[in-house]
Amino acid sequence: MCMTVDPQPSMLSQRKKLPLTVLLPVLNEELNLPAALASVAWAEQIIVVDSHSTDATAAIARAAGAEVVQFDYAGVGPKKKAWALANAPIRNEWVLVLDADERVTGALRAEIEDVIVAGDRDGYYIDREFIFMGRSLRCFRPNWNLRLFRHRLARMEDLQMADVPGTGDNEIHEHIEVAGTTAYLRAPLLHDDDRGLTAWLSRHNTYATWEAHVYRKFRNEPLGFGLPSFLRLDAFRRKRALRRIWVRLPGRPLLRFVTWYVARRGFLDGWQGFTFCVLMSYYEFTIGAKMCELRTRDAQNVAVGPQDSVEVRDAA
């Protein structure tokens, strides 16, 4: 991977800012980026990790005083966040990972300042408030992600899925792990994509491709735990263990709808909530369809053998 970095802002202009580095992975985010940058302007360092955007993303970042690092993906791991944690010029102990369609509210900023000054924990989970088609969805919460952490203790989880074709250069549902103590902040991140529903649908089609490979991997592996060991897991690993159970359940699209619309009370979120829950059910259906396609291809490759397989592709 190669990297180019903008000149650092003057230390004079940074003197009164919070000793925090914000990592912002982006690609063609000119619509979302200004609001995201404005919401963390109080941070001492902002690093925008770009993938050679063809719009005004890099120019917007530089104009806001952020450093721009260009990431070149080689088709295999690491992907963008993992690479940035290891290679970006991070100069603060504390790091906040922020997506371009997210905003740090005033309440969350105050909490971040307090916990960094206190230094009682090594990482913090942050909830997300999701704005969907103009409405804040109560059914989406809580949605905890570990986003604030001590840099030296953090790493991206590795599901061995960095080379799945057609899924881009940024992590999808891998999470950050911290070798230390963690806690939960009260105020949420605001998640509001200005690109609208079309971008959401396109993004989740890509996610479904990646998830299909993960589902296939998990279904081909043993569970690897029993009830006693499951009960001893921490919250993060218990969630991962539940996912291995989930991929084995029948009727997942229906279960997904019931979970979101009934158990998580999506029916209280109006027509936007109903639309979101239907789309999440369809998302689960798409994952299953793509997993069936993968199994069919696997069976065909086994049946014809590698040499015949090459000849068929050449003939096509």
Regions of interest found by a model, annotated:
Residues P19-T21:
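Cell-envelope/extracellular polymer assembly enzymes that use nucleotide-activated donors
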